[in-house]
Amino acid sequence: MAENNSQGIDPALAVQETGERQLSEAERRAAEEAALDDGSMTLTAHLTELRSRIIKCLIAVALGSCVGYYYVEEIMHYLTLPVGKLYYLQPSEAFFTYLKVAVFVGFLLALPVVFFHVWRFFLPALTRTERMILGVIVPTSVVLFFIGLAFSFFLVLPAAVRFFMGFGNTELEALFSVDKYFSFVLTFILPFGFVFELPLVITILGKMGLVGSDFLGRHFRLVIFLSFVLGALITPTPDVFTQSMIALPMFLLYGVGYLIVKYIIRN
């Protein structure tokens, strides 16, 4: 105490300054919440917030990419399990493929952060009810997207690779380039992430009253046809096998959405 007084520091004044800083911080937070509630943010404030959130999303992707590159050899090990050994045909091909894998993993790791900042940016324009609804929809969509990727990678992709490798013989041996193989894997699994959003989309449409269980039930045959058409459009190969691997889950997910609309939303 004597030392503090000798240095000219008043303990009471220090406590008062600390309390003022805490009060100003609380007031700042209260002002931000009030601006979110009444949507009174100016255009400059919106642009500043947009810039801040974009930077945070890019930082999240960059950090996720660093994590992905740190574990890139382990990731490549799991990616190559369906085919075994891969080759690179150019000196820089392996390096740039590793970078692509790291950035893709970084994007997946940062996806919840990106969705969160997108949701927070549009929050001032939403009512409290809409905020509660989006608070359920956004996490659900992220979970369904990852389930679709996992379903494709662990179940569909190995079967598809075995199917394509079955065309080899003694005169025709498979030789996979690491870059071409990763591009194939990427274009193969991504559509499943979006396809698995189908039950959520149907549920939202049913909740809004735009579709009902009767409407969904009457169009089952049309859905089967459209599932194969969409499977042909979004698959990287023109064969019926790959199209069926997308069309069948799409049809089953449509059935899940139908059951939700019929038995849950109706009640």
Regions found by a protein language model. Give the residues of each.
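Membrane topogenic/interface segments and analogous intrinsically disordered interaction regions
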Residues: 1-267
